[in-house]
Amino acid sequence: MALLSAMKLQGRPPPISSNLNPNSKPAGSDSVSLNASEPGSERKPRKFSSQLNRWNRARTLRSGAKLDSTITNGSNNTTGPMRPIESSSRTDVSTLDSDVSSSSNGVSEADMTAAKSIYIVSDGTGWTAEHAVNAALGQFDYCLVDRGCPVNTHLFSGIEDGEKLMEIIKQAAREGAMVIYTLADPSMAEATMRACKLWKIPSLDILGPITESISSHLGTNPSGLSRGITNSSLNEDYFKRIEAIEFTIKHDDGALPENLEKADIVLVGVSRTGKTPLSTYLAQKGYKVSNVPIVNGVDLPKTLFEIDPRKVFGLMINPLVLQGIREARAKSLGLGSSFKTKYSELGSVKEELELAKKIFAENPTWPVIEVTESAIEETAAVVLRLYDERQSNRAMPRISKSY
């Protein structure tokens, strides 16, 4: 008890076992073990690096590779996706109730509160649910990192068998996890909802309400087939994405300027404004993208000013941020001091950005997007919104013309 009190005062939950086997011993046995070594030998909480910002730390915690792990299984940390337990072949919800209730007694209250888990279950790739969960967790970074309430997410994809589904839900009940699911098969979704309600598991169906609303709006029933699984047929969209990716790779960093007319989107900006990763992201959505660098002393290709201006987008960034990015880039490449001065010196950076502003001012039909504090996904969303508006000759209402 004294040891537990000391650990609570330090703000650290006691270590717990990750053994979730239905036959695990009750609390108080070997399934929950406390370190009874001398206080001086206790592991001190790891201090976070000043180089690691809150967002990255939170994502590290959510991925399961915790910065200060408290969940142990023997001597090994539990990392990576968890797998369903192999204990029962029964799939009926009502007959599994007693099994879960009896085995959950082997997990103590401390086990349930030390770390929170979210199970993501999908009959496809799980991409939709996983990204929705990560987006929502982004609202809790202040708690996940600084207030010591880490959350682990575990993805179970390709779950099309009722037996496997029930095993996952049983495991979630034992661990006290939340279940978030996208199951296209109505019977699977219904079974999940009933099981979670029976065992008092917090759960959320991401796909169901949206599908029902669209079904009502269209006046037709959904197919109930999952999308994005590995054995899905290769359709036109798949080959369109492959073609777009191949095109984008070949036309990176100003290559083959004679083909700019063939691109759906053309990105223009100075070095290290994120043109290449943004191009790749857009290509994965099926858009052929070329990007053209703005460099002092190098003329832009004439074809850039001859193509449809509705497909051209400029990228702008804060000079201090750009300088930091370039310094890190030069250091990683082991470049000489003379190149570093020309490439990452603040005066040179500002000079290039002034040149970019001048070019953008001379071409007012090109939207200029500020990328300093934007993630690739956020910038891509702005590009695609503007692209759609310009291609369809319609403008969506917006609060500001600042992108």
Swiss-Prot record:
It is an enzyme of class 2 (transferase). Changing R326M: Weak interaction with PPDK, and loss of phosphotransferase and kinase activities. Pfam families: Kinase-PPPase (PF03618). Changing R329M: No effect on the interaction with PPDK, but loss of phosphotransferase and kinase activities. Changing E352Q: Weak interaction with PPDK, and loss of phosphotransferase and kinase activities. HAMAP family: PDRP. Belongs to the pyruvate, phosphate/water dikinase regulatory protein family. PDRP subfamily. The initial 51 amino acids are sufficient to act as a chloroplast transit peptide and the removal of the next 35 amino acids reduces the strength of interaction with PPDK significantly, which suggested that these residues are important for binding RP1 and may not be part of the transit peptide. Interacts with PPDK1. Bifunctional serine/threonine kinase and phosphorylase involved in the dark/light-mediated regulation of PPDK by catalyzing its phosphorylation/dephosphorylation. Dark/light-induced changes in stromal concentrations of the competing ADP and Pi substrates govern the direction of the reaction. In the dark, phosphorylates the catalytic intermediate of PPDK (PPDK-HisP), inactivating it. Light exposure induces the phosphorolysis reaction that reactivates PPDK. This is Pyruvate, phosphate dikinase regulatory protein 1, chloroplastic. It comes from Arabidopsis thaliana. The gene is RP1.
